[in-house]
Amino acid sequence: MNCISDFFTYETTKSVVVKSWTIGIINRAVQLLIISYFVGWVFLHEKAYQVRDTAIESSVVTKVKGFGRYANRVMDVSDYVTPPQGTSVFVIITKMIVTENQMQGFCPENEEKYRCVSDSQCGPERFPGGGILTGRCVNYSSVRRTCEIQGWCPTEVDTVEMPIMMEAENFTIFIKNSIRFPLFNFEKGNLLPNLTDKDIKKCRFHPEKAPFCPILRVGDVVKFAGQDFAKLARTGGVLGIKIGWVCDLDKAWDQCIPKYSFTRLDGVSEKSSVSPGYNFRFAKYYKMENGSEYRTLLKAFGIRFDVLVYGNAGKFNIIPTIISSVAAFTSVGVGTVLCDIILLNFLKGADHYKARKFEEVTETTLKGTASTNPVFTSDQATVEKQSTDSGAYSIGH
């Protein structure tokens, strides 16, 4: 029966006005902190009154310029930039290991790790290098034997140390970026209206002196990313050129401007002794008069640039404004919960406050009170002072 009785109960709020300087100051201080948080952080900093578009649409076109010297040759853009289409990801080659006049055939491996004494050491379980292992151990020189391969011969020797193209430090990168926020049908580009042809020809990007110049010097990009050019050019690496578009569309159109930042994207592989840096291979193919094909194999080390575009835009909208305002006013009530905890557990006279705040009323209690004191309400008023709030009692302190 007790379970049934407990189930069929009803709870209602009893309002108690506590006139205490301590709890009053705490209550107002908490309310002030909550209001300050919503006004300062939520509304002003996070702009919760705006609807935001994070689905930025972007296109990037790049162009590299500069000349360098490498292996007694003058290198231009067609020699050291790949791919040539001017995409958002491109590589500037700074060092190459060249293996010329390779033809299809049989030849010994040239690396020390393929050294052998007998054919049994050149089985298919051995990891191949420059081609398919034939299973034979052949003479590489008069003093060394290595496993034979079938493929492009002679095989590559990539353990030699080659110089780097130092002129690449002064190459320039031109970036043309266009963005669009589809929710607001807002379009803009990094070539700002105040840039002239004269400015484009002579300006170089600098985060303070020329933050909107679209032409970047390679050496500056490497420096802004916290890297050493000579070391990076020798081993290769991947750098990120980040263009951020964070726009408040409640402001003027010309205040939506790009912000450039730079970082190394392969920082983890840089510390690896297994495969540090960045390199790749490609070949140039030729044919002799008799129709035989041969090629020049190039192992290229270079700096890969990834142009990364990100951003979001915000604009005033009544719906998020109402939602944020309601959340702010509702959160003010959190102060009441905190003050109740302090009032009922930590302040002097906590038991007295608990007795006033929580009261259990049953039908038996009401009948007994009514029979012994017909003017119960008026008598109670002599003990407790009725406040101006409806249904509230004031407890002095």
UniProtKB/Swiss-Prot annotation:
Ca(2+) binds at D158. Contains extracellular allosteric binding sites-distinct from the orthosteric binding site. The lineage of its organism: Eukaryota, Metazoa, Chordata, Craniata, Vertebrata. Glycans are attached at N139, N170, N194, N290. One of its GO terms (cellular component) is postsynapse. It comes from Mus musculus. Extracellular ATP-activated non-selective cation channel. Plays particularly important role in sensory neurons where its activation is critical for gustatory, nociceptive responses, visceral reflexes and sensory hypersensitization. One of its GO terms (molecular function) is purinergic nucleotide receptor activity. Has high sensitivity to ATP. Fast activation by external ATP. Exhibits rapid desensitization. Sensitives to the ATP agonist:alpha/beta-methylene-ATP. Subject to allosteric inhibition by AF-219. Mg(2+) and Ca(2+) slow deactivation of P2RX3. ATP binds at K63, K65, T172, S275, N279, R281, K299. NCBIfam families: P2X. This is P2X purinoceptor 3.
